[in-house]
Amino acid sequence: MASALNSKINPPGTCQGSKADGGAGWRMDCDPQMHVKMCKKIAQLTKVIYALNTRQDEAEASMEALREAHQEELQNAVAETKARLLQEQGCAEEEALLQRIQALESALELQKRLTEEALAESASCRLETKERELRVEAEHAERVLTLSREMLELKADYERRLQHLTSHEATPQGRLPQESPETKSEPGQGPEMQEVLLEVQRLRVENQQLSKDYARKAEELQATYERENEAIRQAMQQSVSQALWQWQEKESDLRKNFQVQESALQAQVRKLEGDLEHRGRKISDLKKYAQKLKERIQDLDVQLKEARQENSELKGTAKKLGEKLAVAKDRMMLQECRGTQQTDAMKTELVSENKVLREENDLEAGNLHPQQDQSCLKECPCMKGGTDMQTKKEASAETEYMKQQYEEDLRKIKHQTEEEKKHLKDQLVKRLEDLVKKHTVEIKSVRSSVEAERKKLQREVEAQLEEVRKKSEKEIKQLEEEKAALNVKLQNSLLEVLRLEEFIQQNKTRPTGAEESPQELGRQHCSILETQDPCLKLDETSPRGEEYQDKLAAEEGTSSDEEERTKVLLKEGSDPQPPLGSLLKEKTSKIQRLEEDWQSQKAKLQAQVSQMQQALEQCTSNYREDLQALKQLSDLEREKLQRELQETTQQNHAMKAQLEASHQRALRMLEKARHQELKATEERLKKESSHSLQIQHQTHRLELQALEEKARQELQEERERMQAQQALLLESLRQELSEQQAACSGHQKDLEALQAELRALGRQQASSQCPGDSKDHIIATEERGGPGQAGSPPGAAGQGSGEGCGLWEENAQLQDAVRRLRAEVEQHQQEAQKLRDQRRFLEETQQAQRAREVETLRQEHRKEMQAMVADFSSAQAQLQARLAALEAELKDSGEKPGKGASRPEDLQLIGRLQTRLKEREDIIKQLTEERRFHYAAFPSAMSHRNRSFSFNPHPGYLTPSMKKKKVEDVPSRVVSVPNLASYAKNFLSGDLSSRINAPPITTSPSLDPSPSCGRTYKPNQSTDAKTATRTPDGETAQAKEVQQKQGSPHQEWFTKYFSF
């Protein structure tokens, strides 16, 4: 075991000393390099950590500086916004603007209301005219219906009388054959027959008279209708002209009012626009400033975030690098420990191997010879050299392995660092997105808060403006009340002064009137009371009358004293007469006292009057100043209003021009839209009809193809079956013929063989006889053997003839068989011909059935086309109604034509009414002409019923022959213009709704695939008298259809059809 291990570890040619020296050299070579690399990495990491720390400090300092600047800018912005809001709070013009806007809105509402009233009046007038037209038409229709009914009653009565007379005539004619021939030969024929004939003549005269009366009544009704129509037309023209004149006057008045209002409104609107522009500029400036602040805040926030992110990144990278350094140090320590352990283990192994080798060598040296010892001694250095080389190789391999591991570790570390960088970048991006979202949310919240604050401030400003406005209104009302009170005071003071002057003059003129002094004092007292009452009232109403309350109380006291004195005097006057001296003394003393009191009162009153005058002068001066200020303000407002009026007038003119242009554009657009809609509907209907026709044609073709294929398949199957049968028969016949031919060929061969034998026998007989030799011998021989020889050839000939007969019989049988076969072939041919005839008959029946199916499909197609045309007419009616509604809306929206000119709507209405009247006059004239023609042809068709008064729901179909022609013959194109006969028919039948609706429309031949669609209309000439006397309605309808079939242009019926 030990030798085996030694051989594995130490191969031959190695030595212990070399191995130990190699391991120590490798350790000395590797340790300094690793140490230098580790020192370099540690130095790099320390530099990075120092740089990161310095960057972090700088970022924190810059963040603090940015935060301080941001706070300062925010404080400045808040201060500026507060100052501007405080400045804007003092603006009290918004209320005036709101009032003006309200006034403008009220004026606009009034204008709209007036326009709506005018449009309602116009609509009512139009409705009245339409009602009048409908009423007149209904009355005329009722009259015509009554006349037609009378005529029908007369006709029915006439027919009853004729039937009665014919029945009476029939009874004597039945009795006449029973009478004798003598009575037949009588010339008189009886008085009853003469009476009957007279009655018939009388009835004929009555019928002619009735027809004349009916024609006369119809003419009279026509004349009355024309007169009424003319009167209605004149009245309508007058009413329309009056209504137009009234509408024009109203429009001119309304336009004047509107122009005045528009001028005022335009001025106010311009002023408001200027104010709004000024305020909008202010608001835009504030918004710009706020936006700048927000942008600055955003920039600062972004810088802060970037600095924080850089700081966090630096911290993270520093931490990671520290961790990586620790890991690298641990790895290096572990690698060093492993290397030392490996070198120690190798040293111990080498030492143990050397010891083992030495012991073995010692043992072998004692046993072996000296030669062997020498040889062992020679081999030992070789072994030692081999082991040294092996150890060196192993050390170099281990160093390479260590280097590879180190490089792999470095690569792994780099890969991990790159992955961590990517992960950090992703995290940074996510955090940036989250921060951006948060920042947007914060910005939105800040904006919403700013908007809420702005709205709150605006509301506060509006509330303050409202309060200021209310206060100013209250102050103005108080000033007006004070002004009124002062005016009243002035008037009362002037009255009082005048009364005092009068009283003074009266006292001067009559100083001696002692008796009248009490009365004068009473008057004075009353005047003073009268003057006091308004003064008291004025003091109560006016806020400045508190100064005069004391004076008025003093005056009241003096007046009460005077009243008491006057009462005492009056009492003394009522006493019995005292002595004259005492009376005189008392009177003189009283007069003196009264004079003194009067003078004192006069002085007091003059002082009061002077004070009142001064106060009034002051008040008047104050109010004059106020009035001047108010006049200035009013002048300014007048100027502003005049400017606003001018601006509003200009704006109104511009707006009017714009409105007219827009109205015209709208009308053009509506007309274009209408035409486009009509074209679109027409194209759509054409496309739908063509598409449906194509689909129907395709379905018909597919059905026809399917039927043809089915018939072909059936015929093919029948042919194949018949061919198979014929082929079988022919094969059987061929087999029989081949058998018979084979038999015939066998018989012919037999015949040929027999003929050859006969010829051979004949030749033998000819060769056996010799000419000229011993004729006797020949004769003898003939005599002897002649009968036998002669008997032998006839026997052979009899046999040949029997065989020939048999062959002839067989040939005859074969010929009979051939004849039979020919007869059978002919029979088979006849059967084939019958089958062909049957096939032809089946084909003909199938074609007839197919034609019937095609005819039914065509009829269904025609019905569908009629339904489509009816849908088209209904759609057209809807379009007409829609167009009428659009025109009504346009008319209701109202155009503003020039002054003095009639509106185009009214002119169009008048033109339409005139055209309608002309059309109705033409219809009436044509009806009268048709009636004259009818009554001219009436006596020849007396026994026939008048078809013009038949209540037929289909106006174009009058007679059965005409019905057949209408159903059978198809017109050349779609007729959508209502003819005059159908219109007259509907008019006479009393169906007023049929005038509006179109007549029944026939199908288009261009869409009909039948071959008869291109034929022109040719009326069938019948010998019947009933069909010969056609009504004029049918003739007019035929004439119109013939004209249409002769090819009137497409545009003509289109314009007629779409002329509304």
From Swiss-Prot:
This is Protein FAM184B. Residues 1-24, 165-191, 532-566, 681-700, 762-803, 994-1050 are annotated as: Disordered. Residues 1-17, 994-1009, 1018-1030 have a biased composition (Polar residues). Belongs to the FAM184 family. Residues 51-159, 192-333, 402-502, 584-769, 806-934 form a coiled coil. Keywords: Coiled coil. It holds the Pfam family FAM184. Residues 536-554, 681-690, 773-785 have a biased composition (Basic and acidic residues).
